[in-house]
Amino acid sequence: MALVKICGLQSLEAAETAVNNGASLVGVIMVPGRERTVKQEVAREISQMVREKRISKGSKYLDSRQLRKEWDDCPLEDWFEYNVKEINSSGPFLVGVFRNQSIDEIQQAIHTHGLDFVQLHGSEDFDSYIRNIPVPVITRYTDNAVDGLTGEDLAINRALVLLDSEQGGEGKTIDWARAQKFGERRGKYLLAGGVTPDNVAHARSHTGCIGVDVSGGVETNASKDMDKITQFIRNAT
């Protein structure tokens, strides 16, 4: 089953709607001053909710750090498929999205808000950050900035790779043909950039991605739309 991440959440209601309909990852924006930046108290409420969901289902990974401990035995060619399977079966998990913030700031946010995953969305030195972040990391790439990278480069110590349009979070549709070629040459990835309830099924079948990430595509008037969240997850999976 495809992995679904609903991102840019700013309310417990929207996060619960996502989780109750099958999203394995829910994301909050931790970058200060953005349109979708989450309030600290809301981030903590969502963190508590996803942890309680994992406890109630007897999740294998109550602490996401346990996932990293099993990577040593996973062959590179199965890396991302393995992680998707484990996340889907053991989630939901909370992802904190950061952009060019310090490692210290990220570490503090993990502790304060109980983040399960970190997503790096800027020009960070990924290898350096990953070595110093205790939870699994998702790294984001644009579809026109991956030349020269191999599947092995992308897999090492990353939980997942996110392939996005140039202007992430603004609804700009990614070039699906380039996304398909990326997957053929460099392995599996999550697809973001312009996916909506109406096109997500086609996007998945056309690109071969192993999961999808959406924010603006499930909004109405700049707010998360519960019906769109529900329909998106249904169509994606």
From Swiss-Prot:
Q: What is its EC number?
A: 5.3.1.24
Task: Give the family from UniProt.
Answer: Belongs to the TrpF family.
What PANTHER family does the database record attribute to this sequence?
A: N-(5'-PHOSPHORIBOSYL)ANTHRANILATE ISOMERASE
The protein here is known as N-(5'-phosphoribosyl)anthranilate isomerase
Give yes or no: UniProt keyword Calcium: no
Q: In which organism is this protein found?
A: Komagataella pastoris (Yeast)
**Gene3D superfamilies from the UniProt entry:** Aldolase class I
Query: What is the organism lineage in this UniProt record?
Result: Eukaryota, Fungi, Dikarya, Ascomycota, Saccharomycotina
- GO MF term list: phosphoribosylanthranilate isomerase activity
